[in-house]
Amino acid sequence: MTNAMKIIEMLRIIDNRAKFMGIKLTMMKNLLEKYKDNKELLKEVLKLTEGTRLHELILEAYPPLEELKKEIREEEHKIKITSESGGEEKKEFCTFEGPVSLIAYIKEYLRKYYLGNNVKRIFYDIGKDYAIKLGINTYDDMITFMKKDFGEVVIEKSEPLTVVVKDNKECKNCKASEPICYLTAGFIAGCLENMTNKTYIVEVTEEKCQAVGDPYCTFVAKKSIRLD
């Protein structure tokens, strides 16, 4: 099943590989048109790319998205009015219950004041790009590096591949309503793509997180698109 993140990844590939703007926009249009009947999926693509160059490109490539963007704004406005009229105190997405890592603080600060929901994709991409730049391409190197910067790592080489991180610094002493270790997930994805010599795009999803009360963080990796 195609999700918004997979579409965004394919759009990024088009952006990076198509040299001429006309060809780039046509390829993006053809891709987005495939999902024209799934408005909620396209809305999610718009939300996750908000504030980026890619966002502007896809609006140019596929003008019908402008109407969906208006719908998103109207929906957000209604939610805001409902919240204000209800007089409920606005809750933080993530709260701290003790000393947290600098990255955890920066992430929540950017979410609250600047990035909103976009923080998820941005920190995922940062982690992924960092791993790719480091050139980590073996499980042993991945475990060694993550032990220093994230936490204790156990890799279950099953299908799908599962990575368990204990005492993850990204979420230690954090409390949230959903998994929040986007940087860790992206980093794992980058390492695994290196291990496949970038033959596949790898998607990593955090299914358990200490921030929501789980005993450890669990990440599941899946190869989503073959590139060769």
From Swiss-Prot:
Pfam families: V4R. InterPro entries: NO_sig/Golgi_transp_ligand-bd, V4R. This is Uncharacterized protein MJ0855. It comes from Methanocaldococcus jannaschii (strain ATCC 43067 / DSM 2661 / JAL-1 / JCM 10045 / NBRC 100440).
